[in-house]
Design a protein with these regions (language model features):
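Mg2+-dependent endonuclease catalytic cores in nucleic-acid-processing enzymes, primarily RNase H-like
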Residues: 51, 56-178
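Acidic, glycine-rich loop-and-beta core segments that form the ion-binding/anion-interacting portion
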Residues: 31-65
């Protein structure tokens, strides 16, 4: 599909090196009852963006319903934004495990914030497992057809998906198993 969009339809873009190609921008239901499960993901940031995604799961597909994407804000400033934007406090919010104090602040505010368990593995192996899951690679022997649907209002998520690529070896021109 990416090659057709670029070479067939004449759209701008680069096919090579994209980490995820199984996503599309689409108007999707914002009714949480339309999904089998709802989760919230949060990647803490300050200089880099603090990103919160409201996700729906249905039939093995991921639906990115809403995003909060802010820079240079303390947790105490972000919590009211999440409440104002209707992020459901009673759904599990999976958070970056490196920031237990921030998780505690969310819990104190009434959110079901939990640290993501990175198990006892290297950061690279953990990241690789996350990418495999997003692609639909459940195990070495089981792959499912998974599509990630992104609501058009999630402009920062769309931008990140368009820019998330594998590192390219400058000498050989080959892509490495290392996200950038």
């Amino acid at each position: 599909p990416e090659g057709y969009q670029i070479y067939g339809l004449g759209e701008w873009g680069e096919v090579g090196g994209l980490i995820l190609k199984n996503w599309t921008v689409q108007n999707i239901s914002q009714n949480l009852d339309d999904y089998d499960d709802i989760a919230i993901g949060q990647d803490f940031g300050f200089n880099h963006a603090n990103a919160i995604l409201l996700l729906g799961i249905k039939d093995d597909n991921i639906y990115i319903l809403q995003e909060i994407y802010v820079f240079e804000k303390e947790t105490a400033e972000i919590i009211p934004l999440a409440i104002q934007d209707g992020i459901p406090a009673k759904r599990t919010m999976w958070c970056d495990s490196a920031e237990p104090d921030r998780i505690k602040a969310w819990r104190t505010a009434g959110f079901r914030a939990r640290a993501v368990s990175k198990e006892h593995t290297t950061e690279k192996k953990y990241q690789s497992a996350q990418i495999d899951w997003l692609k639909g690679i459940v195990s070495k022997d089981r792959v499912i057809h998974r599509t990630i649907y992104v609501h058009p209002s999630c402009v920062n998520t769309i931008k990140e998906l368009q820019q998330w690529k594998w590192k390219k070896d400058e000498r050989t021109g080959e892509y490495l198993d290392e996200p950038v």
